[in-house]
């Protein structure tokens, strides 16, 4: 009988080693709600764009279609990035952290990733006990969602 693959075993793997996705997929660590945090990063600039949640079906759809799909906790439904705004994310690479409990999505983002119209959701920095806004919207959010 073969031993089940674990993320702990992957720690000992060497660069270039490959493992069957079906075996790895069984070890992904979802939270009690069946979700895993997914961080989207622009593949070429490496700018961190956003963090959202995926469930197993959203992860599978993303891998199959190449377009990023998340799970919306507030709407309790699938959220295919760009469905309403047209600002899609095309998957370039998908990586798990060492524990298998977080995902890094390297994406090609069309336009802003943030619902505020900014390229990144991470536009507020804290310095000297002050919250400083780092960027302006590149698209008016009203125009972005045609409200």
From Swiss-Prot:
The keyword Amino-acid biosynthesis applies. Binds 1 Mg(2+) ion per subunit. One of its GO terms (biological process) is L-histidine biosynthetic process. One of its GO terms (cellular component) is cytoplasm. Keywords: Amino-acid biosynthesis, Cytoplasm, Histidine biosynthesis, Hydrolase, Magnesium, Metal-binding, Zinc. InterPro entries: PRA-CH, PRib_AMP_CycHydrolase_dom, PRib_AMP_CycHydrolase_sf. It is an enzyme of class 3 (hydrolase). Its cofactor is Mg(2+); Zn(2+). Mg(2+) binds at residues 97, 99, 101. Its main location: cytoplasm. Zn(2+) binds at residues 98, 114, 121. Disulfide bonds: none annotated. Its EC number is 3.5.4.19. Pathway: Amino-acid biosynthesis; L-histidine biosynthesis; L-histidine from 5-phospho-alpha-D-ribose 1-diphosphate: step 3/9. One of its GO terms (molecular function) is phosphoribosyl-AMP cyclohydrolase activity. It is found in: Cytoplasm. It comes from the Bacteria. Homodimer. PANTHER family: HISTIDINE BIOSYNTHESIS BIFUNCTIONAL PROTEIN, HISTIDINE BIOSYNTHESIS BIFUNCTIONAL PROTEIN HIS7. Belongs to the PRA-CH family. NCBIfam families: PRK00051.1. This is Phosphoribosyl-AMP cyclohydrolase. It comes from Hydrogenovibrio crunogenus (strain DSM 25203 / XCL-2).
């Amino acid at each position: 009988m073969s031993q089940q693959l674990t993320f702990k075993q992957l720690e000992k793997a060497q660069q270039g080693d490959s493992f069957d996705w079906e075996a790895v997929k069984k070890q992904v660590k979802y939270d009690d709600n069946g979700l895993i945090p997914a961080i989207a990063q622009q593949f070429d600039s490496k700018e961190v764009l956003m963090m959202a949640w995926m469930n197993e079906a959203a992860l599978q759809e993303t891998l199959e279609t190449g377009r990023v799909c998340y799970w919306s906790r507030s709407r309790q439904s699938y959220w295919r990035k760009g469905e309403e705004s047209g600002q899609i994310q095309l998957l370039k690479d998908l990586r798990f952290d060492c524990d298998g409990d977080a995902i890094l999505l390297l994406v090609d983002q069309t336009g802003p990733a943030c619902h505020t119209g900014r390229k990144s959701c991470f536009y507020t920095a804290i310095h000297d006990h002050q919250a400083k806004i780092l960027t302006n919207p590149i698209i008016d959010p009203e125009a972005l969602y045609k409200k």
